[in-house]
Amino acid sequence: MSEVRDYAKEVSDWVDGVMEYLEKIDITDSPLLSNIERLSGLAKNMDEEEMDYEDMVLIEEEMARVYEAIEELSREFNIQEGQSVPIGKHTLPPLSYAYDALEPTISREIMYLHHDKHHQAYVDGLNKAELMMKKARETNDFSLLKHWEKEAAFHGSGHYLHTLFWEVMIPGGGGQPRGDLLKQIEKDFGSFAAFKSHFSEAAKQVEGVGWAILVWSPRARRLKILQSELHMVLTQWDTIPILVLDVWEHAYYLQYKNNRAGYVDKWWDVVNWPKIAVRFTEAKKLIWKEQ
């Protein structure tokens, strides 16, 4: 019974996050709301005797439909708003899959804490920093500006990297990319195997906590692998991240203990190459003249 309750709570939390996001973009009348209401009802009516594999599939399919609709609404909202988020109004993006969907690679407990607690803390920290700097402008008191700029850099980078991190993973992922992305990887790194080894070692060798990041450089017109300590140290400007791997301890420690290498090696099983390929295609559209 407890496992069913836990799953029901996760679905309910996901629905709450979706509703918060829809409220933010002022969606009050949409066919999507009926889907969300149906999903919420499924979560509330879960019962251990009645819950079976088909029920879970039904819930996962409903969540996928809701997420696809949200992505479309989000695109429309960004166009209408000029891709602008009001100061201090960043929100936690909902996941497109349940917290247990990446098991056994990443446990449900890790995903819940990582997304619902850690990522939310970055969102809150970014919002607070933005509002405090807005207040500084309004009062012409910049005595704490250095502090709030650091807070914005840390929490803002954490928020944006985590948002991408959730997107580049998917249940049943893995394998290797195809098409133009694979060709570019082979061109820039020699082979997919060489790229994978390089990226994995970059992740394993991050000093302390941080990220491994595959970026597209519009000026160099090639892919690069970067490390980032914390969320924003040792990276390069004027590049576009297309694949990121979180190697902060909160991303793996509850499951892999101090075996970061084991986590990195298993993580490739959930990589969402189709999504990464889309980001690569869009990133290549930005062209700068090399200076």
Label the predicted regions.
Residues 1-291:
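Feature for soluble, non-membrane regions of globular proteins
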